[in-house]
A protein has these predicted regions:
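PLP-dependent amino-acid enzyme catalytic core
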Residues: 2-250
Length: 250
């Protein structure tokens, strides 16, 4: 992984597998693919740099504006600036605090970053709500449909189901360990009535759920037949979205 020159940050973003043998993909392709075919994770080939002045200029901006400035350099030409701004606006419209991730001062030396103002009260809403909108626009433009499969111990599953419920072009199946998530999380996953989201209780623990998901991704014939995608932390788009609040709180 190298560091990109500023003038190249928007045009030549490519994503490579950590294991080095999977095809090189664009941001959009890497996002829709999830786990690389060689078993690695997709990461940017080059890392765009933000200067001190650019970071300093974020002071006082809204969370949405900061999100745009932090993430846009990693997208290449996947979305126009206007498209991405609209995506960000839709993603965070349902948060219950104007600041989205307010930094609260407790005393002279202690601050608390509140990450519970999303629709499921989990910090993972910050990434899932954005990924849902990114997936929907990408799939609509491509005329494609994907099947998202994930494993959860609670908060990932509820955040994913909330983000993708009712969206076109996506079916979501979340595996969770039976009797090992909180009642609130179970209800968040199992009560949405939209036909494209499904919560599946597995007799076992989280590792058993994760093993089943990995088996599906490693079965290339099955993976291709249902166009499998993932939104667990294997997906770079999720990691990128969750980096924004470090800038907003700085």
């Amino acid at each position: 992984m190298a560091f990109a020159k500023k003038e190249k940050r928007l045009k030549h973003m490519q994503y490579i597998s950590t294991r080095g043998t999977a095809p090189v993909l664009s941001f959009e392709e890497a996002m829709l693919t999830g786990l690389a075919r060689d078993g690695g994770l997709y990461l940017p080939e080059t890392v765009p740099q933000l200067s001190k002045d650019e970071i300093g200029a974020m002071a006082g901006l809204s969370y949405e504006e900061i999100a745009f400035r932090v993430m846009q350099p990693f997208l290449g030409n996947a979305f126009s600036e206007d498209e991405f701004k609209q995506i960000i606006g839709k993603a965070y419209a349902g948060f219950q605090h104007a600041a989205k991730a307010p930094l609260v001062q407790l005393d002279s030396n202690h601050f608390l970053l509140e990450l519970f103002h999303g629709p499921t009260l989990a910090f993972k809403d910050f990434a899932m709500q954005l990924i849902g909108q990114l997936f929907q626009l990408s799939l609509q433009r491509r005329g494609e449909r994907v099947t998202i499969v994930g494993a959860t111990s609670g908060d990932t599953g509820s955040a994913a189901i909330e983000a993708f419920r009712g969206l076109a072009g996506v079916d979501v199946f979340i595996l969770y360990p039976h009797g090992r998530v909180s009642d609130v999380q179970r209800r968040q996953m199992s009560t949405p009535s939209e036909g494209n989201v499904h919560a599946i209780a597995v007799d076992g623990d989280f590792d058993d759920c994760q093993a089943r998901v990995k088996d599906m991704f490693n079965d290339f014939e099955f993976r291709d037949s249902v166009r499998l995608a993932g939104v667990n932390s294997i997906n770079w788009a999720r990691v990128l979205a969750q980096a924004v609040y470090y800038f907003s709180s700085a």
